[in-house]
């Protein structure tokens, strides 16, 4: 049996000229801004124009483009190798980005050429949110219908409590905790992408799933009297978002004079929000030598095993 696995990710501009259209696509998503047209279109145009210069400066810090596609390609290659250890089926992994290339319509044409017996949708979002997982799935389904991809399709919605996912995080955090311990008693900050409270109040389970991921990791770390906190980054705009902010927790750690071990708990690949926000902007808050940023899971063997097993064990 031939199986196509579709890895969903956010996407990112592949040049500085792509920054504004990328931002427009992001803010035009009705799962991000829930307004009817033409209001959503006009607001997306306004926000993307207003934020373009700020965003361009961010991408200039990391070579003029987002590394998310290259990172996702490495994850796709590693996952495909792992999946094809199972000789009963032939797996091919495709990358589908939500807000920049490759878009769903391009990927669907490639999938049709592969002609699979089954399609598996696998978001690179461990914790489910309507703004990420659901948005990607709905966009895929709409394009699959439009471009005539008729195939048995299965979906993976979440894996925030997957044993291998938890263990992969635990191992990385333990390594950096040991380094930080040489300075003093570290505080572990679990930094997740923030969401507006209005979305959470509508029943989005993202925050509760982030909390459960962290609970399981803390339990697995089994460090006596571990000092830890969940915090949220990347807020934009004036509305209320999930709190506390990562910045405020770093300022608190600075005031307390403790080393910080920061784990990007909701990110599985490196991009602007880790490489610039965490590694440059937030790092500058903490005293030199007191900041230990844990890498994203990327192609960690346990994480790749997690992704492969999710596909293999689907009913």
Curated annotation (Swiss-Prot):
Catalyzes the ferrous insertion into protoporphyrin IX. PANTHER family: FERROCHELATASE, FERROCHELATASE, MITOCHONDRIAL. CDD domains: Ferrochelatase_C (cd00419), Ferrochelatase_N (cd03411). Keywords: Cytoplasm, Heme biosynthesis, Iron, Lyase, Metal-binding, Porphyrin biosynthesis. This is Ferrochelatase. GO terms for biological process: heme biosynthetic process. Fe cation binds at residues 193, 273.
């Amino acid at each position: 049996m031939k199986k196509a696995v579709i890895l969903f990710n956010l996407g990112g501009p592949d040049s500085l000229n792509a920054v504004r259209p990328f931002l427009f696509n992001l803010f035009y998503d009705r799962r991000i801004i829930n307004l009817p047209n033409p209001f959503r279109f006009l607001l997306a145009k306004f926000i993307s124009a207003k934020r373009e210069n700020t965003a361009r400066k961010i991408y200039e810090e990391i070579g003029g483009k987002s590394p998310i596609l290259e990172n996702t390609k490495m994850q796709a290659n590693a996952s495909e190798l792992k999946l094809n250890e199972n000789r009963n089926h032939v797996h091919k992994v495709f990358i589908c980005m939500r807000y920049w290339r490759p878009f769903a319509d391009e990927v669907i044409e490639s999938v049709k050429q592969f002609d699979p017996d089954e399609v598996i949708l696998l978001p690179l979002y461990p914790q489910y949110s309507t703004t990420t997982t659901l948005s990607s799935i709905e966009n895929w389904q709409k394009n699959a219908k439009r471009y005539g991809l008729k195939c048995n399709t299965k979906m993976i919605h979440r894996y925030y409590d997957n044993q291998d996912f938890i263990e992969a995080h635990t191992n990385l955090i333990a390594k950096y905790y040991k380094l930080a311990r040489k300075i003093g008693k570290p505080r572990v900050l679990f930094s997740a992408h923030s969401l507006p409270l209005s979305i959470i109040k509508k029943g989005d389970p993202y925050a509760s799933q982030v909390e459960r991921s962290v609970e399981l990791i803390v339990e697995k770390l089994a460090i006596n009297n571990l000092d830890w906190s969940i915090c949220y980054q990347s807020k934009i705009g004036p509305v209320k978002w999930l709190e506390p902010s990562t910045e405020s927790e770093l300022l608190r750690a600075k005031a307390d004079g403790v080393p910080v071990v920061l784990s990007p708990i909701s990110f599985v690949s490196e991009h602007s929000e880790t490489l610039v926000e965490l590694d440059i902007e937030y790092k500058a808050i903490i005293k030199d030598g007191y900041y230990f940023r844990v890498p994203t899971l990327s192609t960690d063997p346990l994480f790749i095993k997690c992704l492969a097993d999710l596909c293999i064990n689907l009913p």
